[in-house]
Amino acid sequence: MSRTGYTLPVFAAAAARAALLHLIEKVPCASVQLDLLGEQAAIPIEQVARLDAETALGVTRSDPGDNLDLTRHTPVWAWVHLEVGTGEVLRLEAGEGLGRTAAGEAAIYRYARQLMEANVAPLVPTGRTATVRFILPEGRALALRTSNAAFGILEGLALLGTSGLSQPLSAADHLESFRAALRERAERERRLVFCIGAGGLQAAGRLGLDQGATVQTGNWIGALLVEAGMLGIESVLLLGYQGKLVKLAAGIFNTSSHVADGRLETIAAGAVAAGADIETVRTVLEAPTADAACALLAAAGWAEKIYAALAERVSGRSVEYVRKYTERTMAVATMLLDRQGRVIARDRAAAEWLAEP
């Protein structure tokens, strides 16, 4: 059975709460209880240290459970300093290893701030302000293995996420739970929206799509497309991050990077088919991430044409895949998103899907 862990903002909030409790109560702290805005969690604390009368440091370590997450076991520090009130209860800062946006702001996003308001702000003594500086000693090095820089997070990791739970969506024993959810939806719906990742699910909400027709897929897009075909589903809209979905254009229907990649090669092939010059194709192949490739193509004026064609090919290959394994024809439409969940391309079938009542 796969083990659920927690996202990075949870450990940041836990370290901050532990440091502030130690500063106020002057007692050791082996764990802290956190309100995850819906449920409670006990988070182990590795160390707390009082640095002076007004300053303490809390240290914990990231544990994403069985999810494939590069932050596993990375240390998370929170430096907390109390001072005479300045009109705000909490001041959050980025220390070493926590990224900043291109505008220089700390990469601390909404859910992380909500956790801090719920779990740290109530502990701040009346008339005081707590400055919390998050430090990720390995963050700068780990960020080099992500696509953070491609969407504006520089010099470190981000406290990013919409939930405290880190679900192991790529673990093999979760496929059956996805299939069960699909079967449940198929009992009442003939058209389904396959949401690839949390970004796909959030985009479905923003686009006003029927939440009762959404199905999360993890990396098993091919298996679930076939299941949908066997269940007699009429059509499926694929909605997700382009770096995942373009793999389907190359016939890769398990999108885990541990199974196969080929993203840049597929995008480069799309550039060739669109008539891009050889230098543009070369820059795609040399791009560090799929996001970077997309940005390069946008700057060169090629992105719209290339990704629209890739979306068409994703749908076409998906229809062929379902027909091959079920001998049935199921319509498929595709919308490609960037890392922020914005639509960068859709095929004609997706445009028709959105136009229907």
UniProtKB/Swiss-Prot annotation:
Methyltransferase is among the record's keywords: yes
GO biological process terms, semicolon-separated: anaerobic cobalamin biosynthetic process; methylation
Catalytic activities: Co-precorrin-5B + S-adenosyl-L-methionine = Co-precorrin-6A + S-adenosyl-L-homocysteine
Lineage: superkingdom: Bacteria
Cited InterPro entries: CbiD, CbiD_sf
Signal peptide: none
UniProt GO molecular function: cobalt-precorrin-5B C1-methyltransferase activity
Biological pathway: Cofactor biosynthesis; adenosylcobalamin biosynthesis; cob(II)yrinate a,c-diamide from sirohydrochlorin (anaerobic route): step 6/10
Enzyme Commission number(s): 2.1.1.195
Short name of one Pfam family: CbiD
Keyword terms, alphabetized: Cobalamin biosynthesis, Methyltransferase, S-adenosyl-L-methionine, Transferase
NCBIfam families: cbiD
Similarity-based family: Belongs to the CbiD family.
Descriptive protein name: Cobalt-precorrin-5B C(1)-methyltransferase
Species assigned in the record: Gloeobacter violaceus (strain ATCC 29082 / PCC 7421)
Organism placement in taxonomy: Bacteria, Bacillati, Cyanobacteriota, Cyanophyceae, Gloeobacterales
